[in-house]
């Protein structure tokens, strides 16, 4: 068996399946896609000769609805609860030796009850793998990492990935803590966007103290709060009121205005937007900001409809890129802290 395992948000398996299918077709690769709603993952089975290409081109950062992508090695069903280890050892590829082991389960109603089993099984499997020469004694991030994903007590997927090519969090979920002083939970969305959509080098270069940013539809101020923690000067646009702690902050200027109509008096380094509005309207307005040179970098959310979400996502991003005109770096992801939405990062490469 060969192919890809991709984790996703529960309920978005059809969107991920459609995205994988469309992108595989563009690569000229045929594959069999298995997806069941609310299971939290999708399988793409294909010819072994095509797996490396898929892993390179369908990198987790490039896929919108995937939290993690793995090389699929085996699917084991009807495992005996008294000895799950022997069949797993037998099903592993002869090479390589793995540098780390993650025991996982889908982030779904079906998968979450397996968390306890995953913890205990990892403690049992790890020493056996080391004794068999299949797992390094010490962590080796540069070696492939073995993933054992429990779908039930007797049903397991075996996969692997290289650390440099994968999401650095188990289940593809960054564990962020909402601080008491955060104005709203939406702060977690922007925090996750910054660590998911930008590399560490990009964050260092593009989020420098003293830079200027605009937060459209800012109230109550969750995204503004994240930006000032990066020491950016923020103009917060909203007719509603910000939290008092932000109103009195020296890095914050609150302007009572409609976020869709307001224009900056001078170019900004950043613009962020988490307004509840039709996704096509948001995409078009965001394109104006780049086309007019009002900002260089932006992060915004697109609230998706209940149906045809992949089609709407593709349409909005194509419309945004076309109308922005300028050469772009464009990345989008459905984040763990998103709901029925995706988060988009765009940067003007001409400036």
Swiss-Prot record:
Which GO MF term does the entry hold, naming one?
A: S-adenosylmethionine-dependent methyltransferase activity
The entry's active site is 303
Residue positions binding S-adenosyl-L-methionine: 186, 219-222, 238, 258, 274
- The Enzyme Commission number assigned here is 2.1.1.186
Q: Which GO cellular component terms are attached?
A: cytoplasm
Enumerate the Gene Ontology biological process terms: methylation; rRNA processing
Provide this UniProt record's keywords sorted from A to Z.
Cytoplasm, Methyltransferase, rRNA processing, S-adenosyl-L-methionine, Transferase
InterPro entries on file: RlmM_FDX, RlmM_THUMP-like, RNA_MeTrfase_FtsJ_dom, rRNA_MeTrfase_M, SAM-dependent_MTases_sf
What this protein is reported to do is described as: Catalyzes the 2'-O-methylation at nucleotide C2498 in 23S rRNA.
Name of this protein: Ribosomal RNA large subunit methyltransferase M
Q: Which organism is it from?
A: Xylella fastidiosa (strain 9a5c)
